[in-house]
Amino acid sequence: MQKLLLLTIFLFIFKTGTSQVTFTDSNLPIVVITTNSQTIIDSAKITCDMGIISNGIGMRNYMTDPFNNFVGQIGIEIRGSTSQQYPKKSYGFETRTPAGIALDVPLLGMPAENDWILYGAYPDKSLMRNEITYHLFSSMDPYSPRYVYCELVIDGQYMGVYSLLERVKIDHNRVNIAKLDSNDLAGDSLTGGYIIKIDKPTGSSSTSWTSPYQVKVKFLFHDPKDYEILPQQAQYIQDYVTAFEDTVYGPNFSDTAGGGGFRRYINTGTFIDFFLMEELGRTVDGYRSSSFMYKDKDSKGGKLSCGPMWDFNLSYGNADYCLAYDTTGWQYNFATVCPSFTSEPPHWWARLLQDTIYTHDLKCRWNDLRQNILSTNNVNAWIDSVALRLNESQQRNFTEWPILGVYVNWNWFVGNTYQEEVDYLKWWFKSRSEWMDANLPGTCPMVTVAVPENETEKTTVLVYPNPFSTAATFSFNHADNSEKTLVIYDLLGKEVVLKNIAGGENKTVIEKNGVNAGMYFYHLKKKGRTIASGKLVIE
């Protein structure tokens, strides 16, 4: 197999076929696939050989270099739905043993697994709309797909700039929840784990179920797959989601006092982060396609969670229909803008905004994110850094695929240069963020705190897990061994927890104990002076 791959390189250097690019080296890793005279199709994986050249950050990678990151067999197929119309294809592949068995391997520094994607951006001429979403969300929630930019060669043909990307699935290093097996048919074992998604069914009707409240909302089984999940398991997760819908559309949907409201079923923190990212990107397919949800076992806090984010190539002003290009307005109202579409966002997104605690938490989370992760300066710096890294490879990509200055379904903006595409992305993000600053519902009163008289008294507190549903641990190490006070305030500045704790190195557990779900502020104090503070989310 190594010889076959080396032969592919030799043929590529001396005969580029129909490629417009003579490709010899790159600052990005190089992925080389040999199909052995087969055709990659979308209905079944074919067995091919693959090698990866990656000499490390700051080092150049040459087509004549040995495969030093991976060399072996894969099963590969074309992936995507509407994206299959584009000449630059994306691929799903599985790393395998010579016997054809799935083989977990680490690729380009990402944790070992066997399910991968080679994503080739086409209508997204910035080459980074998916990637910026995954990058930002990785700092917000437990898991977001990892990726590494690379350049792809198939059978001697230069294919362009790609992202080698993790496929969403249940795994310790991906969506880290329990994995169902055939014995998990009752009790706690039946309650998780599940990954489902709201999407367009691509197979038979058995692959999905329809919301009893909206015929245009389809839920698909993702992991376990539709052909793996057992009837009892499929019925359980369907009943759970329906119970959530029954509650959220019911008359007492908030019911924070009685504990019977929607918070009984969902991790509100993940719903908030999902909502903010969907609205920030204003993805034209937002909420109604490629929208993942997952649930762990009840014994592990198994409420329904939203995420990870997926499929943002037609986001951030990159679609010319249904007002997706407009930096004003809400994407969750898609059905009122384009009522004729066969799919629509679940109405629960609008319903949740009728809960004042939820909108308080939403506003506070947004304000916090805009100070760091989602600040315009932070996002612009990331975009500029990626554009710089891709400066060389994007030229080859757009030589092979000469679409700069050309309309591709469904571009709203058509830049004549790569830099114009990058600048438009930055402008759109800034404009959209500022509109959300002014129009996001909810209020977030700030708690006034004293500034430490001696700045050297400040310390760092680690809170985990955060958000939490039963208890959280506050860990810190302060040089002064005197007694400290931990105070937790609600959004109106009212004390809900006050606990005296020892100084020095300390780990203190705070239990929920009837405190309502929502966002709170904690302050670690010494003699009345705040030496550390932060935000806390209780589910």
Regions found by a protein language model. Give the residues of each.
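Short, solvent-exposed loop/turn segments that connect beta-strands within catalytic domains
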Residues: 58-63, 298-303, 528
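Conserved catalytic motifs of the protein kinase core domain
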Residues: 161, 302-305, 460
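Sec/Tat signal peptide C-region and signal peptidase I cleavage site
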Residues: 15-19
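Middle-to-C-terminal accessory/interaction subdomains
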Residues: 27-29, 38-41, 46, 80-82, ...
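C-terminal outer-membrane/trafficking sorting elements
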Residues: 5, 455-464, 468-539
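Sec-dependent N-terminal signal peptides
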Residues: 4-13
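Phosphate-handling architecture centered on phosphoinositide signaling
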Residues: 20-274, 327, 379, 403, ...
